[in-house]
From Swiss-Prot:
Subcellular location: Secreted
Tissues showing expression: Abdominal perisympathetic organs.
Keyword line: Amidation, Neuropeptide, Secreted
Protein name stated in the entry: Periviscerokinin-2.1
InterPro entries linked to this entry: Periviscerokinin (IPR013231)
Pfam families the record matches: Periviscerokin (PF08259)
GO biological process terms, semicolon-separated: neuropeptide signaling pathway
Residues found modified as Valine amide: 12
Amino acid sequence: GGSSGLISVPRV
C-alpha cells in the first residue's frame, strides 16, 4: 500500500 502523512491507502 501507500502511506501519505497520517493516511494509509491500499494500492489497487
